[in-house]
Amino acid sequence: MFRRATSTFLSRASATRRFSTDVATPATNSSFVEAWRKVSPNIDPPKTPLEFLKTRPPVPSTIPTKLTVNFVLPYSSQLAAKEVDSVIIPATTGEMGVLPGHVATIAELKPGVLTVQEGTDTTKYFVSSGFRFIHANSVADIIAVEAVPVNQLDRDLVQKGLQEFTQKLNSATTDLEKREAQIGIDVDSALNSALTG
């Protein structure tokens, strides 16, 4: 009995919608709209999830020559659809170089230097944290909580902050104070290595 029910259900499900991006999905379910109009003719039917779906961007058949980068902060956009040669991104799993045609991935950013290579020009940003999304169509979306061009960092302030957080860590009595001081040390150490390296 169960076997018959599942085979009937699966045959109906596969007949209604296939797993393919080439097949267009119907915008609305016509039987649902007809049933809705019978029950409440004066109210427009609600939008169904199928109406909110967008088609996937096409995956190119050849590897593109450029990587499109969107680098966004909560208050501004550093790079919007900028075509570059490569990007080196600091992630919690390690630094990752991204070239055109890279496999689709998602990762969390860690404090470090984001390097954007465009021809012979190299631009470096210090990012505090965030996420990066690499799409199959050679688009990289980088969302950072805070980012500063490395050439705008003040070496003296970084050294002062590193000393201050080291003192706070040594004098901390609670776990919260220790963790806050450790985060400050991690960020200032990454800032210091960005300036020296």
Curated annotation (Swiss-Prot):
Its main location: mitochondrion. It is found in: Mitochondrion; Mitochondrion inner membrane. InterPro entries: ATP_synth_F1_dsu/esu (IPR001469), ATP_synth_F1_dsu/esu_N (IPR020546), ATPsynth_dsu/esu_N (IPR036771). Keywords: ATP synthesis, CF(1), Hydrogen ion transport, Hydrolase, Ion transport, Membrane, Mitochondrion, Mitochondrion inner membrane, Transit peptide, Transport. GO terms for molecular function: hydrolase activity; proton-transporting ATP synthase activity, rotational mechanism. Residues 1-19 form a transit peptide. GO terms for cellular component: mitochondrial inner membrane; proton-transporting ATP synthase complex. It comes from the Eukaryota. Mitochondrial membrane ATP synthase (F(1)F(0) ATP synthase or Complex V) produces ATP from ADP in the presence of a proton gradient across the membrane which is generated by electron transport complexes of the respiratory chain. F-type ATPases consist of two structural domains, F(1) - containing the extramembraneous catalytic core, and F(0) - containing the membrane proton channel, linked together by a central stalk and a peripheral stalk. During catalysis, ATP turnover in the catalytic domain of F(1) is coupled via a rotary mechanism of the central stalk subunits to proton translocation. Belongs to the ATPase epsilon chain family. F-type ATPases have 2 components, CF(1) - the catalytic core - and CF(0) - the membrane proton channel. CF(1) has five subunits: alpha(3), beta(3), gamma(1), delta(1), epsilon(1). CF(0) has three main subunits: a, b and c. PANTHER family: ATP SYNTHASE DELTA/EPSILON CHAIN, ATP SYNTHASE SUBUNIT DELTA', MITOCHONDRIAL. This is ATP synthase subunit delta', mitochondrial. It comes from Pisum sativum (Garden pea).
